[in-house]
Amino acid sequence: EMSASLVGSEMCIRDRDATAVFNMLSGYSEPLSWNELAVAPIWLRTKFTKLIRRETKHAKEGKPAKIIAKMNSLCDPGIIESLYEASAAGVKIQLIVSGICCLKVGIPGVSENIEVRSIVGNFLEHSRIFYFFNDGEEELYMGSADWMPRNLDRRVEILFPVLDDELKKRVRHILDVELADTLKAHVLHADGNYEKVDRRGKIALSSQDVFCREAMENVSKPSHGYQGRVFIPAEPVE
């Protein structure tokens, strides 16, 4: 239990949707709809496309619009095209992509509003987080899928909203810290090359060091499950 507090993936899924997923995987039933989840290979691509296009619509209406996405890989042509359209409309897009990224930044009139950074440190990060400004009604999602054809079209993947206010703050904190990383982050340029973040005038910050420190602080605090517990060794067998 204690190690699970230190090492784990962020997860928050409603029980009815979780049951429906396992029923689908087992062949017991095919859900006609979900309460909160979007599930690949049928519904997930449509969900992402709608979320991106909503930001595009808001930008065209002159409203503030923003997308932040963290993932391992980005190479889906359809998603990239939607991001280009959003950028051209004025949506500010910040992408944290640790691995493959086929999107090209810095194309005049197409991707000038897109920033891509990669953070590769001592630990392999596996979380996928998606933030949409939504005209001030901010929405946060987490899930298992990268923006790749195999994840959106050929695998069972899930996306779920982060609804609890405290969890939203925690997840947004993760994004903010990674966007502030000046030690391990590399920024993608228009020529396809990555370069270390320009640290001039900025605080030296490693996002993974911050998360490790916070994890150690959290695990050192007595949790509800451990309060009042005292280990009493058994008497030796005579």
PLM regions with names:
Residues 14-32, 46-47:
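Short, compositionally biased "basic patch" segments
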Residues 9, 23, 173-177:
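Short intrinsically disordered coil segments
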Residues 29-33, 41-238:
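PLD/PLD-like phosphodiesterase catalytic module centered on the HKD motif
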Residues 1-8, 13:
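Single conserved hydrophobic/aromatic residue that forms the stacking wall/gate
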